[in-house]
Every structure is written in C-alpha cells, then in structure tokens.
C-alpha cells in the first residue's frame, strides 16, 4: 500500500473517531497536546503525523486499544498493543 493511501486512510479514520466522540478539532488538539491547525492539517492530508502523535490522538479520543492499533496501522505504523490483554507489544516505545 502506498504511503499516500495510509495518510488518506488515517485522516478519514481520525475524522470519524472525532465525530463519534463529538469533539472539535480544538478540543482534540488540546487533549493531545498539539494545535488545532496541526489536527486540521492531519485530517486534510497536509501533515504526516508521527507515531507518537497518532498514539496521543488515539488516547485523547479514548479509543479502545484495538482501535488504537487500527489507527496506527492506518497511519502506516505497527500496532502497539497486544490483542489478548492490551499491554504494549515488545519493542514498543510506550
């Protein structure tokens, strides 16, 4: 899968999760420790989020661990959580 496809997939997934949680870009940005502009750029594919930013956004959205893995995969990163118990996978920087 091309990198651009990952970006589009993540941008759509992030918008969908933000909509489910009914939070604004500003509210999400404040909770994730970034700016509203950065969230806007990520959602419109004008910025590529790093792995840590993807994790922070997923945590700020209180996404279930399985969905956090899905968001990481959508952004082109390896999953961070084991399927069995939600603990970080070995080698994770968490």
At which residue positions do the language-model features occur?
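A short, Lys/Arg-rich alpha-helix, primarily the initiator
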Residues: 1-21
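Short amphipathic recognition helices of helix-turn-helix/homeodomain-type DNA-binding modules
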Residues: 3, 30-31, 49-55, 59-94
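Short N-terminal amphipathic alpha-helix/helix-capping patch enriched in small hydrophobics
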Residues: 10, 35-38, 53, 67
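Residue-level signal for the short linker/turn that defines the boundary of a DNA-recognition helix
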Residues: 12, 22-23, 49-52
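Residues within the helices of the helix-turn-helix
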Residues: 15, 26, 55
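Short alpha-helical DNA-recognition segment
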Residues: 22-41
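Short, conserved catalytic or interaction motifs in soluble domains
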Residues: 44
